[in-house]
């Protein structure tokens, strides 16, 4: 299930305001418990979506955190002072465009949001934050869910020093992805996550792992890794280039797609399985995404389906 938690729905539920509740649009906690139980009767399991890089700005944690610099949740999010001229702490561009920083007058500081302004990043360096997130995940395991998809997990570890990066577009900014994805030290957090939540449970886990190279896969999946599987991005990023907007397209060659798929297939084959996909809630239909406008859509769809259904995974 994509997120079914209470949410203002700024980002289709990926802005969560309560990690242990159910959005009234979808039902009640009792309905969820019934769904889990009825699925088990049919030898199926419910996999939930965990969004742990950030919360909604309407989450009680953030509402308290932004209220002052000395409250109990003050350090639960990533706050920084402005530059001497009052501008944002760094020139980082958010994944959805615009600055990755938003000013909060209550604190007189900026908060970091990798994605939308309404999705402030949680401070994983704070052990209280990690413990609260682990409790929420275990809450659902106690309810009987069969596992988790963990959203945007490669962004949870931030660099020790926040500084400007080399601009990658005419706006003078650099993608926050370049500056924060898969930062060294992230595996310490993830192995703790595994110990505190995954271990001891017969569950399935899949991480949305943008920025993990094929050579790093053994650290992320398999017996000595963290997750059962990983969503990789190399192949779906072949037609994409970073820029000022969410998705700038560029011409691409089949050889690049083949190389990206071959590398991930070889890397994962040594350790486990890789979920194969060409489209999801973040991407346009694959026929539109991968094919030029003058391509035959029927032949293109058949070609993409042939590749998709003959890969290992």
Could you describe each region identified by the protein language model?
Residues 1-313:
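Active-site and adjacent substrate-binding regions of carbohydrate-active enzymes
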């Amino acid at each position: 299930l994509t997120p079914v938690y209470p949410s203002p729905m700024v980002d289709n539920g990926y802005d969560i305001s309560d990690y242990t509740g159910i959005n009234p649009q979808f039902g009640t906690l009792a309905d969820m418990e019934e769904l889990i139980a009825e699925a088990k009767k049919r030898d199926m399991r419910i996999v939930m979506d965990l969004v742990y890089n950030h919360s909604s700005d309407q989450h009680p944690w953030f509402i308290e955190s932004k209220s002052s610099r000395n409250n109990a949740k003050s350090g639960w999010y990533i706050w920084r002072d402005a530059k001497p001229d009052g501008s944002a702490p760094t020139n980082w561009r958010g994944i959805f465009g615009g600055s990755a920083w938003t000013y909060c007058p209550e604190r007189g500081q900026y908060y970091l949001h990798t994605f939308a302004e309404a999705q402030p990043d949680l401070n994983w360096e704070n052990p209280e934050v990690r413990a609260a997130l682990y409790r929420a995940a275990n809450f659902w395991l106690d309810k009987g869910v069969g596992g988790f998809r963990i959203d945007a997990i490669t962004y949870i570890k931030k660099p020790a020093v926040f500084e400007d990066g080399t601009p990658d577009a005419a706006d003078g900014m650099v993608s926050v992805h370049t500056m924060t994805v898969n930062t060294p030290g992230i595996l310490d957090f993830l192995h703790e996550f595994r110990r505190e939540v995954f271990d001891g449970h017969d569950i399935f886990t899949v991480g949305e792992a943008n920025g993990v190279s094929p050579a790093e896969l053994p650290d992320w999946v398999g017996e000595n890794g963290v997750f059962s599987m990983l969503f990789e991005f190399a192949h779906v990023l072949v037609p994409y280039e970073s820029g000022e907007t969410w998705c700038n397209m560029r011409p691409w060659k089949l050889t690049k797609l083949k190389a990206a798929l071959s590398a991930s297939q070889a890397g994962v084959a040594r350790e486990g399985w890789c979920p194969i996909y060409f489209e999801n809630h973040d991407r346009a239909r694959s026929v539109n995404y991968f094919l030029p406008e003058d391509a035959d859509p029927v032949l293109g769809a058949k070609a993409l389906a042939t590749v998709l259904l003959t890969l290992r995974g």
